[in-house]
């Protein structure tokens, strides 16, 4: 599926950093003038990070490295979705707000109203959204229009019918009549919003989608539910699931669900 730029938001009393999301064709280039970090003195206290679950692993890695430089600084990480970041940053209960989507205009306005300046964006990494099925599922490829018809009751991509069974996607035998079990993120998630905008064309998710609090929960659900399908970052893949190759439309090239 399409790639998104994942951003970390760092908004404090002095420095404001906001999230951003954009389509990307490849990883961002490192600034050649960027100098190695130099440790300073007098850094201590507590740092709270509240925001995207998709960035939990990255935030943990950064926190561990930061603590090696500054053992007297304690970093607490809470990942419950990108939508939890702006309120926490505005309220001052968090100094870091990782987000996997762009800040909304209303969120920026609320921040500016309190602090007197707009948040600044720091782009940190690129993530790719993938569609996962159980490792035993033999599906070879899906189009974006089919994925929309599976997850959305609006079907704005224009597929010919609502898709509720695996047989409608071409599977035979024991799979043909089996209902498709749907797993996705909750509305606080930037991943939820990105999929809704780009895959569903801002249509509505089906009421049967089992909304999960985190990316790992989606993958775990698909792992234990043989007839399930779910969406998450490709980096969340485990041995229990398989990323489905995706094509933009029928007859187009199917692309593997990998970081490339």
Say what each PLM segment does.
Residues 4-22:
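Gram-negative bacterial Sec-dependent N-terminal signal peptides
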Residues 23-260:
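Flexible loop/hinge segments at secondary-structure junctions
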């Amino acid at each position: 599926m399409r790639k998104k730029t994942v951003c970390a938001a760092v908004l404090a009393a002095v420095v404001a950093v906001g999230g951003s999301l954009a389509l990307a064709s490849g990883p961002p280039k490192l600034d050649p003038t960027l100098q190695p970090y130099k440790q300073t003195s007098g850094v201590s206290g507590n740092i709270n990070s509240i925001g995207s679950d998709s960035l939990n692993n990255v935030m943990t890695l950064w926190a561990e490295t930061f603590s090696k430089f500054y053992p007297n600084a304690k970093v607490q990480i809470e990942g419950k979705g990108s939508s939890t970041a702006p309120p926490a940053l505005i309220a001052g209960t968090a100094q870091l707000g990782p987000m996997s989507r762009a800040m909304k205009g209303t969120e920026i306005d609320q921040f500016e109203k309190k602090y007197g300046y707009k948040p600044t964006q720091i782009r940190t990494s690129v993530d790719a959204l993938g569609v996962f099925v159980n490792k035993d599922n033999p599906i070879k490829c899906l189009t974006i229009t089919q994925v929309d018809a599976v997850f959305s009751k609006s079907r704005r991509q224009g597929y010919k019918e609502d898709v509720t069974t695996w047989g409608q996607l071409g599977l035979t035998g024991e799979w043909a009549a089996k209902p498709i079990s749907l797993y996705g993120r909750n509305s606080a998630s930037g991943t939820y919003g990105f999929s809704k905008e780009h895959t569903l064309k801002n249509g509505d998710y089906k009421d049967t989608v089992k909304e999960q609090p985190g990316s790992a929960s989606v993958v775990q659900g698909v792992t234990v539910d043989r007839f399930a399908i779910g969406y998450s970052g490709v980096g969340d893949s485990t041995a229990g699931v398989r990323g489905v190759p995706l094509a933009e439309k029928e007859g187009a090239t199917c692309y593997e669900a990998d970081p490339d």
